[in-house]
Amino acid sequence: MNPFVDGAFEAKFLTGDTYSSQPASAGFFSRMLPSLSFYSRLFLGPVRWLCSRASKGQCDDAAWVYASAWVADLVERMGCPIQIEGMDAIEAVDGPCLFVANHMSTLETFMLPAMIRPRRQVTFVVKKSLTTMPLFGPVMCSRDPIVVGRTNPREDLTAVLNGGLERLKKGISIIVFPQHTRSREFNPQQFNSIGVKLAKKAGVPIVPLALKTDAWGQGKKIKELGPVKPGLTIRYTFASPLTIAGQGKEEQAAICQHIESHLGKWQQQDGINE
């Protein structure tokens, strides 16, 4: 029995190559006080549940996927439709791979496990502060992530290469956000090639991922707790796997092109002021 398809939450994104939310509208409380409504449900629901399991050493992969899909369900109930394309690419390679994506908000860290883990083992490259935060820290540590400090690029590269090779050899795929910080805008010059370097060294393919998750905004004092914006569409598009050839410059350019082109298309579809 597959532990990830026993219930509606676990199987939420096991819908083939694409997923599209059913039309929904936010309730009165969510429309009037969207951020308060969302965060109260988030922390009293999946976060509390998953943290409780983590404190007991029970934050396993099935729990991770369940909580991830639960968060996605909460977002939809806020009136934010989810559109996902290209999920066949997650299973298009034999063995582990890298998922290299732009980084826009906290939401992708919550949602990606529900898309990827039912199809293959996966963990993240994360900044150290996420592993020491109250509530989130024990959960993130239970996922055996690759931890970087984001203060010394040379040390971060060593950590990613060494930690990445170790996990890839175990068959664990890795999600990498090469941007220095979360941003609604995408600047290729600030999108480093650490994912390409690791893929080349390990001899594994890269699955590029473009995402738009600004429905969960960035906070001014606490970045993870920004304004929630009902009505904004949440979008993810996976591209076909890339095999690194030579120094990887062409593949790095292809990843950036995938992200830039989709962000531009989504802006036109959704409206510049969305």
Protein language model annotation of sequence segments:
Residues 115, 139, 166, 197-198:
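Hydrophobic/aromatic ligand-binding patch that stacks against planar heteroaromatic rings
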Residues 38, 48-53, 93-152:
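Catalytic core of membrane glycerolipid acyltransferases/transacylases, capturing the structured
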Residues 137, 173, 184-250:
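A cross-family acyltransferase "interaction/gating" segment
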Residues 78-85, 157-158, 218-221:
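Short gly/ser/thr-rich secondary-structure transition/capping motifs
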